[in-house]
Amino acid sequence: MLDAMREKPPLVHCITNYVAMNIAANVLLASGASPAMVHAPEEAGEFAGIASALTVNIGTLSTQWIDGMQAAAKAAASAGKPWVLDPVAHYATTFRRQAVADLLALKPTIIRGNASEIIALAGGESRGQGVDSRDPVEQAEDSARRLAERQQAIVAVTGAVDFVTDGERAVRIKGGSVLMPEVTALGCSLTCLIGAFAATAPEDLFGATVAALATFAVAGEDAALGAAGPGSFAWRFLDALAALDGEALDARARVSLA
């Protein structure tokens, strides 16, 4: 799937936060996709109809941004394009909770979050603090299954060991590095990469989500080998993504049934 994406680079419409825009665009470029950071409500809906996939991250919200997100999500859904929701710290404020509730009503095809975000989104009590998860992934697995069934969507919980489910099937993905949480917006970038894989294989959104997470996990392992800390890890991670190919990914991905 990685090789197929590079052979025909998808245009991924990323509505993401200010912190993440640069690294998310570079992650997509290194992986072989084409990023577009378009969030103005005056054009977001039109652009979503052009793009191969849409990703929506609520990290830096405003009323205008929400208008753009909703316009894009409606257009993507109407055009049958996959779209990914990243409900960053949605539990933190009333404004965020309402924004996410409205976006969920527009039926995202994939939802990606940390454990605290997914637990809260499914109706449970999480221990999240701001954008940081205080809950381990394994405690969010049942919540992810319930959320996937309720939303009829793929749900990915990312952390030390990732978890992906469609409500029936479920897998865990091992790999990555302890340095990954020390580089801001890598998780936001992963949401964009999920969109790229979903655009490449819209007929297999479960497999596309797993492939994106496995790509991040293997690249994270490679980047950590020579990294002295988060600074050198960040650029090594981009290099690792660019160097990874489908054969190496298939050989090294650690995916198991859950």
Curated annotation (Swiss-Prot):
Belongs to the Thz kinase family. Keywords: ATP-binding, Kinase, Magnesium, Metal-binding, Nucleotide-binding, Plasmid, Thiamine biosynthesis, Transferase. This is Hydroxyethylthiazole kinase. Its cofactor is Mg(2+). It is an enzyme of class 2 (transferase). Its EC number is 2.7.1.50. CDD domains: THZ_kinase. Disulfide bonds: none annotated. It comes from the Bacteria. Catalyzes the phosphorylation of the hydroxyl group of 4-methyl-5-beta-hydroxyethylthiazole (THZ). ATP binds at R112, T158. One of its GO terms (biological process) is thiamine diphosphate biosynthetic process. Pfam families: HK (PF02110). Substrate binds at M37, A185. InterPro entries: Hyethyz_kinase, Ribokinase-like. Pathway: Cofactor biosynthesis; thiamine diphosphate biosynthesis; 4-methyl-5-(2-phosphoethyl)-thiazole from 5-(2-hydroxyethyl)-4-methylthiazole: step 1/1. It catalyses: 5-(2-hydroxyethyl)-4-methylthiazole + ATP = 4-methyl-5-(2-phosphooxyethyl)-thiazole + ADP + H(+). GO terms for molecular function: ATP binding; hydroxyethylthiazole kinase activity; magnesium ion binding.
